[in-house]
């Protein structure tokens, strides 16, 4: 099993979208790569913790490759916009690819470079090693499964 953490704006939609993909074994939403230990949702929303809303993904690479997973990720975000996805604005809504395995970096860089060909503006999606990931409060986990009418900036139809 492989792991990756993806930030694509509001984590509810990213988790729901990713959880529907064949080969995804587990998803959790949380707060990635900030400076405050174990922040609350309210603290992250204040913009003072440096965390991105993100989705931890465990996947079976015999079913889906990292390259395929990243292609799906690129399809649900606008990687050229800083600190905004859909109607959501703030540093916590920035896009990012946070890797746990250094060996994944070449695939990520190649994927980002390939995706850049689709845009005139530069891609601003962060590519960083995962420094920290704090699981979000329980009510955020599988939020759109529990609340199918909930807000989502990603088209899930």
Swiss-Prot record:
Top-level taxon: Bacteria
One GO term of the biological process aspect: cellular response to oxidative stress
Entry keyword annotation includes Oxidoreductase: yes
Enzyme Commission no: 1.8.4.11
This protein's record includes keyword Oxidoreductase: yes
Key words of the record: Oxidoreductase
Pfam families on file: PMSR (PF01625)
Reaction catalyzed: L-methionyl-[protein] + [thioredoxin]-disulfide + H2O = L-methionyl-(S)-S-oxide-[protein] + [thioredoxin]-dithiol; [thioredoxin]-disulfide + L-methionine + H2O = L-methionine (S)-S-oxide + [thioredoxin]-dithiol
Active site: 10
Gene Ontology CC: cytoplasm
Signal peptide: none
Top-level enzyme category: oxidoreductase
Molecular functions (GO terms): L-methionine-(S)-S-oxide reductase activity; peptide-methionine (S)-S-oxide reductase activity
NCBIfam families: msrA (TIGR00401)
Entry function: Has an important function as a repair enzyme for proteins that have been inactivated by oxidation. Catalyzes the reversible oxidation-reduction of methionine sulfoxide in proteins to methionine.
Protein family (similarity comment): Belongs to the MsrA Met sulfoxide reductase family.
Protein name, UniProt field: Peptide methionine sulfoxide reductase MsrA
Record organism: Clostridium botulinum (strain Langeland / NCTC 10281 / Type F)
Gene: msrA
């Amino acid at each position: 099993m492989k792991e990756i953490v993806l930030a694509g704006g509001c984590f509810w939609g990213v988790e729901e979208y990713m959880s529907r993909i064949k080969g995804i074994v587990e998803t959790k939403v949380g707060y990635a790569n900030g400076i405050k230990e174990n922040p609350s949702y309210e603290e992250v929303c204040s913009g003072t913790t440096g965390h991105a809303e993100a989705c931890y993904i465990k996947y079976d690479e015999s079913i889906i490759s990292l390259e395929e997973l990243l292609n799906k990720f690129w399809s649900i975000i606008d990687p050229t916009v800083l600190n905004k996805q859909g109607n959501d604005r703030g540093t916590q809504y920035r896009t990012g690819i946070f890797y746990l395995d250094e060996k994944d970096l070449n695939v990520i860089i190649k994927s980002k470079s390939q995706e850049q060909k689709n845009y005139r503006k530069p891609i601003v999606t962060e590519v960083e090693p995962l420094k920290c990931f704090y699981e979000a409060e329980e009510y955020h986990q599988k939020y759109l499964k529990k609340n199918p009418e909930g807000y989502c900036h990603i088209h899930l139809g």
